[in-house]
Amino acid sequence: MSHLIILFFATFSASLMAIVFPGLVNITAAKTSAKKGKTNGIVFAFGASIIVSLQAYLGVIISKYLYRNPFVIDLLLKIALVVFAFFAIYFFILAKKNKHKNKVREMTIESNRIRTFFKGMLIAALNVLPIAYFCGMNAAWNISGWIKFQLWDILVFVVASGLGTFAMLYMYVFYFDKLESRTDNFSRYSDYILSGLMGLLLIITLIRLFYITY
């Protein structure tokens, strides 16, 4: 039982620290909070955290046989290339369109929260790199003796991953929601930030794919 407590806090901390720096999911959560209010930002974070939990479970499953099937990593990286390239262009075009709109949009607090929830799930699902992260984390915990591929171990790992992600996303939502004087500027440039992040992830993925291939 003691190893489950260690497993929970270790996984929670690692998942939380994984998204401390700005990335696709947390920047989108902050953008949602700035444009639609704190409640919608939290709903987005909840949807994204559910997908991250599923990715953590997938990471556990894949880590069991990944060393015998290196083509899995290659396939995930190729899928990531297409996704990042598409969204880098998409957010850049969206930022250009928003730049020419001079009307100030009123914040819609009572927007469709169900749509925001599924948007959080979609954005998190498009980011496939956490699967590799959870694979590596799972392998490290296995070597340390904190996880044993049993039902309770896997359940604790998955739940802790989701909660750690939600905790950091909530901080992003709360932080940007408090900066009321800066939310307009953030909303104005958030699409450029997302486009730049997608471009950066595209370059990183290309490097990793080249490294694996050669």
Task: Name every feature range the model reports, one short phrase each.
Residues 66, 113-117, 121, 141, ...:
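Hydrophobic alpha-helical segments of integral membrane proteins
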Residues 1-20, 42-46, 107-126, 152-163:
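Small-residue-enriched transmembrane helix starts and helix-helix packing motifs
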Residues 38-114, 175:
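Membrane helix-loop-helix hairpins that form the core translocation module of multi-pass transporters
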Residues 12, 16, 20, 53-54, ...:
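Hydrophobic/aromatic residues within the transmembrane alpha-helices of Major Facilitator Superfamily
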Residues 128-145, 204-214:
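Alpha-helical transmembrane segments and their membrane-interface junctions
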Residues 69-101, 156-175, 180-214:
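Selective transmembrane alpha-helices of multi-pass membrane proteins
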Residues 47-51, 119-133, 194-198:
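Select subsegments of transmembrane alpha-helices in polytopic membrane proteins
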Residues 3-74, 137-152:
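Juxtamembrane transmembrane-helix termini in multi-pass membrane transport proteins
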